[in-house]
C-alpha cells in the first residue's frame, strides 16, 4: 500500500508534464512537423518548475476532496462488503460519485488547458489557470456535449471489453487472466489516446487567437 500511495502522489505531481508531452504528439502531427523527444523536453524544460507547482496544486486539491468524502467512502466500502443487495449498494454509490464529480469539476476546468498555456503560450501559473477556467466556461456547451459523448462511448467500449474478456475466459480458462490484463491495457490506452486528442483539439480551437510558441 505505501508504494501505491507514493506512485499515486508522484503520478499527480508529474501529470501536467506528461500531459504536455502527450498533447505535443498531436500538435506536431497536426502541423506536419517532426520533433525529437529531446527537442520537446528542451521546450518544456524552462517551465518544469511551473508545471510541478501546478501538479502540487492538483495534489493538494485532490487531498482536500479525499478528506471531504472520506467518511462517505468508508461507509460505502463497509456497505459493499456487508450488503449483498446490489440496489442498496448502487443507491449509495451514485450520490457519492455525483459529489465526487462536482468537487473535481473545478480542478478539471483549471487543468484542462493550463499545462499547454504555460508551455506554448508562456502564461504564468495563475494566468493559465484563470484562462483555462474561462475557456471551459465560455465553451461549456460544446465541451460538455463532447465530454458526454466521449464518456458514454468510453463506458460502452469498456463494457464491450468486459463481455469479450468474459467470453474468452470461459473458452480459454488457462490464459484468461493474461488476456484480461492485455485487453484492459489496450482499452485504457485507446481511451486515454482519444482523451488527449480531444484535449489538444479543444485547446487549438479555443486558444487559436492566442500567441503560441
Residue map of PLM features:
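Hydrophobic alpha-helical membrane segments
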Residues: 1-213
Amino acid at each position: 500500500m505505501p508504494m501505491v500511495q507514493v506512485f499515486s502522489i508522484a503520478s499527480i505531481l508529474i501529470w501536467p508534464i506528461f500531459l504536455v508531452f502527450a498533447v505535443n504528439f498531436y500538435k506536431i502531427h497536426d502541423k506536419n512537423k517532426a520533433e525529437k523527444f529531446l527537442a520537446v523536453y528542451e521546450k518544456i524544460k524552462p517551465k518544469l518548475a511551473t508545471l510541478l507547482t501546478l501538479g502540487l496544486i492538483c495534489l493538494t486539491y485532490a487531498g482536500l476532496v479525499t478528506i471531504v468524502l472520506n467518511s462517505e467512502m468508508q461507509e460505502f466500502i463497509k456497505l459493499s462488503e456487508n450488503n449483498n443487495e446490489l440496489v442498496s449498494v448502487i443507491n449509495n454509490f451514485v450520490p457519492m460519485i455525483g459529489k465526487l464529480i462536482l468537487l473535481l469539476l473545478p480542478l478539471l476546468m483549471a487543468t484542462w488547458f493550463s499545462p499547454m498555456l504555460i508551455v506554448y503560450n508562456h502564461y504564468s501559473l495563475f494566468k493559465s489557470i484563470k484562462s483555462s477556467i474561462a475557456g471551459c466556461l465560455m465553451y461549456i456547451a460544446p465541451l460538455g456535449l463532447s465530454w458526454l459523448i466521449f464518456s458514454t462511448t468510453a463506458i460502452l467500449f469498456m463494457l464491450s471489453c468486459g463481455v469479450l474478456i468474459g467470453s474468452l475466459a470461459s473458452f480459454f480458462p488457462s490464459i484468461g487472466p493474461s488476456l484480461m490484463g492485455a485487453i484492459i491495457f489496450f482499452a485504457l490506452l485507446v481511451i486515454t489516446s482519444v482523451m488527449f486528442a480531444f484535449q489538444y483539439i479543444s485547446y487549438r480551437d479555443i486558444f487559436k487567437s492566442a500567441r503560441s510558441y
